[in-house]
Amino acid sequence: MYDIVIIGAGPAGSTLARQISKSKKKILIIDAENEKNKKPCGGLLAPDAQKEFAHYDLVLPKDILVSPQIFSVKTMDLVSGKIKYYQRYYLNMDRYKFDKYLVSLIPNNVKKINGRVVSIKKDDNYILEVLDGTKKKLINAKIIVGADGCNSIVRRTFYDNNIMKYMAIQEWYNCVDSSNSFYSCIFDKKTSSSCSWLIHKDEYLIYGGAFDIKNSKDKFLEQRERLSKFLNIDLNNPVKKEACLVYRPKKFNDFVTGKDGAYLVGEAAGFISASSFEGISCAIRSADILSKIINDNVDIKKITKLYRNKTIKLKIKLRLKVIKRWFMYTSIVRNIIMTLGIDSIKINK
């Protein structure tokens, strides 16, 4: 019997495990990610996430960072043809190495297993069925925390999961021409109500985007063709393809923190920016909030109430991102902003 089982060892799960490890509780963290099963991600550490790291006095080993480092984003509208540049302060990194670094910070008194939770039942406690390779095992826990991102099994099992979702698809290419911008944000209302991206990482170029789930593959391929013509580049021979679901919160009810000993952190709780899909800062923030509450309390009802209340500020911040999204993704408004050059920078070539 474990006091706490954390499902998912991304930034949210790793942070939570590290911060509650000082307690006398028996803790287990379960993660299915490995070299062959990586989460598709642009791998950019935004300023908000960097600030969260600063609160822990953490540093990033240089082998996590990749080349080049980024100072601006090239924003393109494939319909209007407009291009503008905006200053940004992202760290370009290897997301898989980043996640594994965070896992390495978890003390040894927290047990770690690699596996996938396939079902959860509630009895007096929680009973988790875990698939470890070809073997299934049952694990009992007093408290479970879903840190397993979009379509979390904890959220699907116990809570409303009707939050809007996109299919994020990205492809990797061998990069032989780095003459184009190192980081680009792409809008194309003909193929997506969301955005796409181009990012250089060492010897690779990544092209990806978020698409409506219905016909997502066809829309991705259509946009890829349109982008290839727009930039005059060849995107027909990827060396790797990735895809996953991603949440797009629209209302306060999309943010679910949990109750009765089954809690959610990070994207599993809906804590992700609707405008940029940045979720690392929210993952760390929500995990930090829950860890402090768990460390100071044993009563389930009190944990539930405190966690719900102490994440209100985060929920408001993310609700404002929904409003920001309207300005970014409404084509007529975006065209006005780009035409006027609001907040853009000039590039000297």
Where are the language model's segments positioned?
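Conserved FAD-binding catalytic core of PHBH/FMO-like flavoproteins
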Residues: 143, 151-218
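N-terminal Rossmann-fold NAD(P) dinucleotide-binding loop
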Residues: 13-14
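Glycine-rich FAD pyrophosphate-binding loop
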Residues: 5, 9, 21-41
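Conserved N-terminal glycine-rich FAD pyrophosphate-binding loop of Rossmann-like flavoproteins
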Residues: 33-56
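Redox-cofactor binding/interface segments in oxidoreductases and associated redox assembly factors
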Residues: 7, 146-147, 264
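FAD/FMN-dependent oxidoreductases across multiple families
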Residues: 119, 215-290, 299
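C-terminal helical "tail/cap" subdomain of flavin- and related membrane-associated enzymes
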Residues: 292-349
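Conserved N-terminal helical subregion
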Residues: 51-62, 69-156, 164-166
